[in-house]
Amino acid sequence: MTQGIPAVFLDRDGTINIDHGYVHEIDDFQFIDGVIEAMIELKKMGYALVLVTNQSGIARGIFDEEQFLQLTEWMDWSLADRGVDLDGIYYCPHHPDATEEQYKKSCDCRKPQPGMLLDAQRELSIDMTASFMIGDKLEDMQAATLAKIGTKVLVRTGKPVNTEAEQAANLIINSLADLPKAIKGIKK
């Protein structure tokens, strides 16, 4: 039986794009410098790229699910136009303190819960121990731990890095742009 493919699980806001807070408009979406080139390199290295993003702005009524899906489609096409094909896109619109009742719940998909990562594992046949989770928050690291992802990578491009997040990570880098080089260093 094959183990599956290795993946890089990617948080969105603060990891792929600049986190302006509840980004939901195309005009507000800015890729962080170097991330597209890094994703191209990661694909060449044999990694599936899987987006896993909490989107509590939906639950809070800041934007609706349709707006999120439109932005996500634009982002996906923008990446594809530059040679990056995402293998999976998973999002959680829920929040326990939601103002929008249909999204008000404690769920297993909202990070730090591992639901999105485990769904991707099942649907894409991912080898979790050979995979990486990259994000800017403690919740990203906690979800990766619960999903038994091999390497947890914290980036400094998003929320301010705190001690607890640093301790939960296996590796801390400045940006997703640095991940291919970091992986090559680990694999030596």
Curated annotation (Swiss-Prot):
Location of the protein in the cell: Cytoplasm
Primary location class: cytoplasm
Pathway linked to the protein: Nucleotide-sugar biosynthesis; ADP-L-glycero-beta-D-manno-heptose biosynthesis; ADP-L-glycero-beta-D-manno-heptose from D-glycero-beta-D-manno-heptose 7-phosphate: step 2/4; Bacterial outer membrane biogenesis; LPS core biosynthesis
Record keyword Cytoplasm present: yes
Catalyzed chemical reaction(s): D-glycero-beta-D-manno-heptose 1,7-bisphosphate + H2O = D-glycero-beta-D-manno-heptose 1-phosphate + phosphate
SUPFAM superfamilies registered for this protein in UniProt: HAD-like
Listed Pfam families: Hydrolase_like (PF13242)
Keywords, ordered alphabetically: Carbohydrate metabolism, Cytoplasm, Hydrolase, Lipopolysaccharide biosynthesis, Metal-binding, Zinc
Positions that bind Zn(2+): 92, 94, 107, 109
EC number: 3.1.3.82
GO annotation, biological process: ADP-L-glycero-beta-D-manno-heptose biosynthetic process; lipopolysaccharide core region biosynthetic process
Family: Belongs to the GmhB family.
Name of the molecule in the record: D-glycero-beta-D-manno-heptose-1,7-bisphosphate 7-phosphatase
Provenance organism: Photorhabdus laumondii subsp. laumondii (strain DSM 15139 / CIP 105565 / TT01)
Source taxonomy: Bacteria, Pseudomonadati, Pseudomonadota, Gammaproteobacteria, Enterobacterales
